[in-house]
């Protein structure tokens, strides 16, 4: 006995489903969950770079500047920027022949 004969049977007009309990709440819930899962999977594949970059770097913020005078905030920003700026002399150019 094959699964094909239990679920669907070929007729002259095409394939016909033999399951008559499609109005069962469990079947409806499973269908909705399946459709939502498919939609979320497609969105994840389309926007995975944005989503995971947001999760990775969006939660990591600098220290709180609440209650710190503006002059100290500007000094901190300049220190952070100077730490990011790198002198080109530190790089070694490698040429492949």
UniProtKB/Swiss-Prot annotation:
Any one GO CC term of the record: membrane
Q: Which residues carry this modification: Phosphoserine?
A: 64, 82
The family database entries (InterPro entries) matched by this protein are listed as: Flu_M2
Localization annotation: Virion membrane; Host apical cell membrane
Topology feature Intravirion, residues: 44-97
GO function terms (MF aspect): monoatomic ion channel activity; proton transmembrane transporter activity
Q: One Pfam annotation, family name?
A: Flu_M2
| Membrane topology recorded in Swiss-Prot or TrEMBL | Single-pass type III membrane protein
Segments spanning the bilayer are 23-43
The main place the protein resides is virion
Q: Which residues form a coiled coil?
A: none
In this UniProt entry, which residues are annotated as the site Essential for channel activity, possibly by being protonated during channel activation, and by forming the channel gate and the selective filter?
37
Member of which family?
A: Belongs to the influenza viruses matrix protein M2 family.
Quoted from the entry, the domain comment is: Cytoplasmic tail plays an important role in virion assembly and morphogenesis.
Any extra detail in the entry?
When the channel is activated, one or more imidazole moieties of His-37 probably become bi-protonated.
Q: What is this protein identified as?
A: Matrix protein 2
What is the source species? Influenza A virus (strain A/Mallard/New York/6750/1978 H2N2)
From which lineage does this chain's organism come? Answer: Viruses, Riboviria, Orthornavirae, Negarnaviricota, Polyploviricotina
Gene field: M
């Amino acid at each position: 006995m094959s699964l094909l004969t239990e679920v669907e049977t070929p007729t002259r007009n095409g394939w016909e489903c033999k399951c008559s309990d499609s109005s069962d709440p469990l079947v409806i819930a499973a269908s909705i969950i399946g459709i939502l899962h498919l939609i979320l999977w497609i969105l994840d594949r389309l926007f995975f770079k944005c989503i995971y970059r947001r999760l990775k770097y969006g939660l990591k913020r600098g220290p709180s500047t609440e209650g710190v005078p503006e002059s100290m905030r500007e000094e901190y920003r300049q220190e952070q920027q100077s730490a990011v700026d790198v002198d080109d002399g530190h790089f070694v150019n490698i040429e492949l022949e």
